[in-house]
Design a protein with these regions (language model features):
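Localized sequence-composition bias
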Residues: 1-183
């Protein structure tokens, strides 16, 4: 191997030195996602006629939430105002820590269920059916509003971490995403 050492820089300063795996883990674990930061703070791309006031994932405004092992519905709520009538769909992508997409949840895109939002105040609510068994681990979320195949109206990449409690196998060991996959 050509490279055996890794260095992580922050604001022009060395923040961490170590081997490649440790450096990568340090970089990925020190993302700007603090539990006291709101999901709406991660909205970086949005349509100029769209003004968001509140975003909730799993009934929380903050970017970290827990999914207990007996939870089977994941809720998403987006509130705000629009200056024009808008056709939209909510897309939620669930990813691993390193950015590998595990699932994309977008009913409008897959089933043609596009919402028509009239000009003015709106409150979009989506309930997503979770698998019966969800493995233990963390899911990193990207949340988007879009008119499928037409335009992106809002993008919030890396806006939420879902800590999944997961279940246990027959021998009492936790079933983890890294070993067994998502579900």
């Amino acid at each position: 191997s050509l490279c055996k050492k890794g260095v992580v820089m922050e604001n022009g300063q060395v923040a961490f030195k170590g081997n490649i795996d440790d450096s990568l883990n340090y970089y990925l674990s020190n993302t700007p996602q603090d539990s006291d930061k709101k999901i709406i703070d991660y909205v970086k791309v949005y349509k100029h006629t769209l003004h968001l006031s509140r975003i909730l994932i799993n009934d929380r405004e903050y970017c970290r939430s827990t999914i207990p092992s007996d939870q089977h519905i994941l809720s998403v709520q987006i509130e705000g105002e629009t200056e024009e009538d808008m056709k939209t769909d909510v897309m939620l992508m669930l990813k691993t820590k390193d950015g590998t997409t595990l699932a994309t949840l977008a009913e409008g895109h897959y089933k043609g269920r596009i919402e028509m939002i009239p000009k003015g105040h709106f409150c979009l609510k989506k309930e997503i059916q979770l698998p019966l068994y969800l493995a233990h681990g963390q899911l990193y979320c990207d949340l988007m509003m879009h008119h499928p195949m037409v335009e992106w109206q809002m993008q919030a990449h890396g806006c939420c971490i879902l800590d999944c409690e997961g279940g246990q196998d027959a021998f009492g060991f936790a079933i983890t995403m890294s070993e067994a996959g998502l579900f």
